[in-house]
């Protein structure tokens, strides 16, 4: 599986992306695990570690946008915020594309881990989460309605 969900520090859920999805089923499994968190009806936050993602296929960006659209229809958003750790321009472009089509349902903070030492040895330190959110190089994407109602 390309994404591993670590709930050890719930309500913070760390999702480590080990690669790009190998198949549609692999990607659907990722979406199913996300949906399961919603079905538990507890607030949570994501930390996505995308350091191992090298060449994300465009087709999954479209599917992710459709998934966000479906999440938006829910009465309550259990996802409170997401922090996305990146080290690749390709991943940044993919995220820009996804959120252009379908803005997030909760605040998103995108942090390039190449900026400084808030990540030690590829491990996010719990006391650095707020520092990442507040960091001047962190990009903030506001939850919103879609700019283009394409999907």
Descriptions of predicted regions:
Residues 2-151:
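Amphipathic, Lys/Arg-enriched alpha-helical "gate/interface" segment within cytosolic domains
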């Amino acid at each position: 599986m390309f994404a591993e969900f670590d709930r050890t520090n719930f309500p913070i859920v760390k999702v480590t992306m080990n690669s790009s999805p190998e198949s549609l089923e692999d990607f659907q499994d990722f979406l199913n695990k996300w949906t399961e968190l919603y079905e538990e009806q507890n607030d949570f936050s994501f930390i996505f570690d995308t350091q191992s993602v090298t060449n994300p296929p465009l087709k999954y960006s479209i599917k992710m946008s459709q998934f966000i659209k479906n999440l938006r229809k829910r009465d309550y958003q259990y996802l409170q915020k997401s922090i996305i750790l990146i080290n690749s321009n390709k991943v940044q472009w993919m995220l820009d594309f996804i959120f252009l089509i379908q803005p997030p349902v909760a605040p998103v903070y995108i942090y390039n881990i190449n900026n400084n030492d808030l990540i030690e040895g590829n491990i996010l330190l719990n006391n650095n989460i707020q520092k990442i959110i507040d960091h001047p190089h962190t990009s903030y994407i506001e939850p919103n309605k879609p700019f283009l109602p394409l999907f």
